[in-house]
């Protein structure tokens, strides 16, 4: 509840920064790093990459609003202070972006399933999400999963291991692409 409320406050704050978080650019960036360090381990990578391009093209065509978005809305980045206030920390990925990306990132960082993601959207919107809103959130879940899978593959090439995280993120990409197609 507090995470959703804090994100909504951020998104409605009117604060701006001079840079954006561009998921297409970030995917290309980590894809390049992976290619330079041995490539990816996914047999169906070309197919999944094509699906991600499709989602990015659909989102671009929607011309969604850009507001200050945190991007790294993992539970550990929400500080609950003794006075009852909530503070967001760790702003390294923050930039101007579609605000619904923060809901998607919160869902994948928390390993939410579809039911928990639905509840998160209901809290954020204060109502049942519309089909188009659900499609946008699911698209960003797929894209976020794909991005963080690439990030983890690159980090693994440097000797860091993340256990099942890489596969969980890649699975989000594949699963939520299919969910978008059903909407």
How would you label these PLM feature ranges?
Residues 7, 11-15, 128:
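Protein kinase-like catalytic domain
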Residues 13-71, 82-83:
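An alpha-helical support segment within catalytic cores of ATP-dependent transferases
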Residues 68, 87-90:
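Pre-DFG segment of protein kinase catalytic domains
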Residues 100-129, 142-160, 172:
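Active-site activation/catalytic loop segments of kinase-like enzymes and analogous catalytic loops
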Residues 174-183:
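Regulatory N- and C-terminal appendages and interdomain linkers associated
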């Amino acid at each position: 509840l507090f995470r959703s409320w804090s994100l909504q406050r951020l998104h409605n704050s009117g604060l701006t920064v001079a840079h954006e978080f561009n998921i297409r650019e970030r995917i290309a960036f980590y894809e390049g790093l992976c290619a330079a360090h041995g490539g990816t381990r996914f047999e169906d990578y070309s197919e999944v990459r094509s699906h991600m391009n499709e989602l990015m093209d659909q989102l671009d065509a929607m011309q969604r609003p850009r507001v200050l978005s945190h991007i790294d809305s993992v539970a550990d980045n929400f500080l609950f202070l003794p006075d009852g206030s909530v503070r967001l920390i760790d702003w390294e990925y923050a930039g101007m972006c579609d605000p619904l990306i923060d809901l998607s990132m919160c869902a994948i960082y928390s390993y939410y399933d579809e039911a928990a993601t639905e509840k998160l959207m209901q809290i954020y919107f204060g109502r049942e999400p519309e089909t188009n809103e659900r499609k946008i959130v699911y698209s960003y879940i797929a894209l976020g999963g794909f991005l963080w899978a690439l990030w983890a593959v690159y980090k693994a090439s440097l000797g860091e291991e993340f256990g099942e995280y890489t596969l969980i993120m890649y699975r989000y990409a594949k699963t939520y692409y299919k969910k978008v197609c059903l909407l």
